[in-house]
Amino acid sequence: MSSTPVTLKAVQSEVSARNAKSSEAEVKRCEDLILSYAKQLAKEKDITGIRTLVKSIQNFYDLVGKARASKLIRDIVEFALTVEQGKQEKEEKIDLLKNCIEWATSNKREFLRRSLQARLVRLYNDVREFTEGQKLGQELSKELKKLEDRELLIEVSIEESKCAFNLNNLSKAKTALLTAKTSSNSAFASPQLQAAVDMQSGVLYSAEERDYKTSFSYFYEAFEGYGSIGDKVNATGALKYMILCKIMLNETEQIPAMLSTKEVLPYNTSPRIVAIRAMADAFRKRSLKDFMKALEEHKKELVEDKVVAVHSQNLERTMLEKEISRVIEPYSEIELSYIARVIGMTVPPTEKAIARMILDKKLMGSIDQHGDTVVIYPKAGATKQFTRALTTIRELTKTVDVSYSRTKVIK
C-alpha cells in the first residue's frame, strides 16, 4: 500500500467501481483501502471523518456479505476508539457506535447489532458513564441469555459487573460476575475473556471480602492470561493490583523480589507500576508525607482508579490517624497548627481528621475552637487518684447504708 495519504474521494471511487462481478482480489483491495483510510483518520483524531466513511461505503457492505461486512464495520469502529479522548472525542465515539447500531438494527444485522452494543457497554465503562453502561448491559444480558450466545454474554456480564462496582453496588457486581463465571464454565471462553473473569474476581474479592490473598491469586492468573496473548495493557493492570494486594497484606518487602522476576521485568517502567510502587514505598516507610505525595503525583493511577482508591483512602486515613496519635500522645492540650506542621499538612484537613477521630471514639478529647487547640482527656481508669476516689466513694456508701439501717432500728 502506498504511503501517500488516502482521501475519501479515492475510497468512494474504489467502492463505486466494485460490483457483483468484481474479483476477490479487487474486493480485498477495496477493503484494505477502506481500513487504511480509517487508520489514517484515527491518527488524525478525526472521528467525524470515520463516521462519514462508515456512511459513505454502505453499498459495499451488501457486496461482501453479512459476516465480512460486520467484521469490516467492527474494525473501522475499533480504529475510532483508539483515539485519545477528551470530552468532545468521548461524545463522538458514543455517537459513532450508536449510529452503527442503528444501521445494523434497520438492516436486520442482529449479530452485528449485539456485538456493537457489547462494545458500547465497554466504551461506557472506559469513559466512566457507568449508569448508561449498566442499563444497556442489563438489557443486552437478558437477550443473550435467551439466545445462549455464551461468549458475548461473558463479555457483557464482565462489563456489567464493572459498571455496578463503580456505582458502589457490590451485590449487582457479584451477580453479573457469577453469570460470567457460569457461562465460562459451561462453554469455551477465550484466554482474553478468562483473564477478564479472573481480573474482575480479584477486584470484588479485595473490595468486599478484603481477602487479599485470594485476590492476589486471581490477579496473578489474569496477569498470566493476558501475558500469554500479548495483551500488555491489561497485564500491566493485573500486575498493578497484585502490588496493591501486597500493600494491603503488609508484605511490601516482597514487592522488589516480585518485580525482579523475568516475566515481570518488562512491565516495571509502566506509569501504572511506577505509581503503585511509589505508594508501596511510602507505606513501607510509614511516611504519610510520601504517601500523600504519591497520590498527588499519580492522581490518575491512584485516585481515579476505583480499585486502588477503595483501598488507598483507607490506608491514607489509617496512616493519618497514627501520625496524629503519635504527635498528641505526650500532651494534654496542643495547638492544631503544631499538629498540622509536624505531620506536613494544612490545618483544615488536620482538624477534620481529628474531629472524625473524636466522633469515632479513637481519640478522647475535644477541639477548642477559640484557642485553636485540641484538649486531650485523661483515659478513664488511668490514674491512681481516680481509683482511690472510687474506693473512697464505695466505702462512704457502705457507711451511709449502715448508719441508715441503725437509725431505723433505734426508731
UniProtKB/Swiss-Prot annotation:
GO biological process, one term: ubiquitin-dependent protein catabolic process
Coiled coil, from the record: none
Domain PCI: 212-381
One GO cellular component term: proteasome regulatory particle, lid subcomplex
Gene Ontology MF terms: structural molecule activity
Domain of life: Eukaryota
Pfam families for this protein: PCI (PF01399), RPN6_N (PF18055)
Keywords of this entry: Proteasome
Family: Belongs to the proteasome subunit S9 family.
The protein's assembly and partners: Component of the lid subcomplex of the 19S proteasome regulatory particle complex (also named PA700 complex). The 26S proteasome consists of a 20S proteasome core and two 19S regulatory subunits.
PANTHER family attached to this UniProt entry: 26S PROTEASOME NON-ATPASE REGULATORY SUBUNIT 11/COP9 SIGNALOSOME COMPLEX SUBUNIT 2 (PTHR10678)
Protein function: Component of the lid subcomplex of the 26S proteasome, a multiprotein complex involved in the ATP-dependent degradation of ubiquitinated proteins. In the complex, rpn-6.2 is required for proteasome assembly.
Name of this chain's protein: Probable 26S proteasome regulatory subunit rpn-6.2
Gene from which this protein is expressed: rpn-6.2
